[in-house]
């Protein structure tokens, strides 16, 4: 079968939180912006799709009261003045997405899902199942704010089981993957460690595929240098041993054959179509 290429894709900035740079790469005590990127792509038959959503005003509403307020204090967020993901897409000439792929359920990745009342949500089932069973305080500690999910979320959910994922070939033989559309245009990749059900994505684009590893690292320089994360950053990973194992697998891929991108990496932020916002 001939593989399908995605003719159009773009990163966008969906707001940011401000944190110590040291937490991401162990360098310096200054603060930097950790942009909440989302990614749009156009599939020839499925139309516009989205990966994550960034922040929106719904994040502020969800963190107005306690214990959710603690999350806002720990990760002080600033919304994009250009609007939420739905408004940003419209401004840049994109149709509303039919499907939104959720890499995981941390608030900076699902903060705008309520802005898309007709979209379907695709995710790894364990990513939500594990968090939904926790008390609210524990959910907040895990970075999950249940009020960010719209009413009727389950009616529009496409919850994928791990049994649908299989070992890839060649460079991907260490990864469990799913050819989502069945045409090799988009591969979902299980990248355990950072959060329950954490996913990355391989997009078949020119001039070479993009491997969007979402939060498998926060800075590609840290990934390449193999510098350990500071202790506080290790403790907030869902499983730090799995996180390290995932990074090792990513480093073993031939870097000349793809373009790596990570959600909060300064390099990836410069690729955003609305970088100047």
PLM segments and residue spans:
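Metallo-beta-lactamase
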Residues: 77-96, 126-189, 235-257
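Hydrophobic "anchor" residues on beta-strands that sit immediately upstream
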Residues: 48, 120, 209-211
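Active-site metal-binding motif and surrounding structural segment of the metallo-beta-lactamase
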Residues: 64-123
């Amino acid at each position: 079968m001939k593989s399908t290429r995605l003719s159009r894709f773009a990163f966008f900035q969906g707001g940011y939180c401000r944190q110590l740079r040291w937490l991401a790469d162990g360098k310096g005590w200054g603060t930097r912006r950790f942009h909440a990127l989302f990614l749009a792509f156009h599939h020839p038959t499925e139309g516009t799709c989205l990966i994550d959503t960034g922040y929106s005003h719904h994040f502020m509403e969800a963190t107005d009261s306690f214990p959710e307020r603690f999350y806002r204090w720990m990760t002080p967020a600033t919304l994009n003045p250009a609007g939420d993901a739905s408004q940003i897409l419209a401004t840049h000439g994109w149709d509303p997405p039919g499907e939104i792929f959720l890499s995981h359920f941390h608030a900076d990745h699902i903060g705008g899902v309520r802005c898309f009342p007709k979209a379907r949500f695709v995710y790894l089932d364990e990513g939500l199942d594990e968090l939904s069973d926790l008390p609210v305080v524990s959910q907040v500690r895990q970075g999950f704010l249940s009020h960010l999910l719209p009413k009727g979320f389950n009616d529009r959910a496409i919850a994928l089981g791990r049994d649908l994922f299989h070992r890839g070939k060649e460079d991907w033989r260490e990864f469990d993957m799913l050819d989502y559309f069945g045409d090799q245009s988009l591969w979902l990749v299980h990248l355990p460690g950072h959060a329950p059900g954490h996913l990355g994505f391989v997009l078949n684009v020119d001039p070479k595929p993009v491997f969007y590893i979402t939060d498998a690292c926060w800075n590609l320089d840290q990934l390449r240098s193999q510098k350990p994360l500071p202790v506080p950053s290790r403790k907030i990973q869902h499983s730090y041993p799995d996180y390290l194992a995932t990074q090792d697998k990513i480093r073993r891929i031939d870097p000349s054959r793809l373009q790596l991108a990570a959600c909060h990496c300064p390099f990836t932020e410069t690729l955003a179509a609305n970088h100047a916002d």
